[in-house]
Amino acid sequence: MTRLMKRIFTILVIAAAMIVAASCEKYEDGKPSKDVRSEFARMYPGAWDVEWERYGDGNWVVSFETGKRPDGTDHKAFYDRNGNWVQTITDVLLADVPQNIKNYLQESEYAQAQFEDYDAEYYETQAGDNFYRFDLVMGGRDIEVDVNTNGEVTPARYGYF
C-alpha cells in the first residue's frame, strides 16, 4: 500500500469508529437491566438518539427519536425496574392532532384559550387512558389541559409514574 492509501484507510477507520460511537445509546446513572432494554428494543426497534436516565426508585426514562433523520419525532418512554412499560410521551405538531380532539377542546370551557406552543404531547399509558396534553394561555395564565379520546377535557393530571 502506498503512503496515501494508508492515510485514506486510517481516516476511514477513524470516521467509521466515530459514527459507531455517535449512534450508541447513552446512559445516565448506570445502565438499565436487560429486561428494560429488551422491552424498549421490542417496542421501538427503529429508535435513534437514545438516552437513558434513572427515574425514581430504580425506574427508567428513555428519551429517543423515531422517523427520518435528522428531524425525527421526540419521545420519552417510562419503564419500571422490572422492564414493564408504563407510558410513552410523544411530541405531536398541532397540525397532526386529530380533528376530533381539537373539536373537543374548542367545545370546552377552554375554547377561548390560545395555544402557547406549536405542538402538543400525546400520552400513551399502560392502562390505555391515552390523551393529548396542550399548553394554553387563558386570561393571562399558562395552563395545561388534557383531552382524552372520549372527549373529556380536564386540567392536566400528574402522577402516572
Positions of predicted regions on the chain:
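Bacterial N-terminal signal peptides that target proteins for export
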Residues: 1-11
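C-terminal motif of bacterial Sec signal peptides marking the signal peptidase cleavage site
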Residues: 19-23
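Bacterial signal peptide processing site
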Residues: 25-28
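Repetitive helical segments and hydrophobic/amphipathic motifs
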Residues: 15-16
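First exposed extracellular module after export/assembly in secreted or surface-exposed proteins
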Residues: 2, 31-161
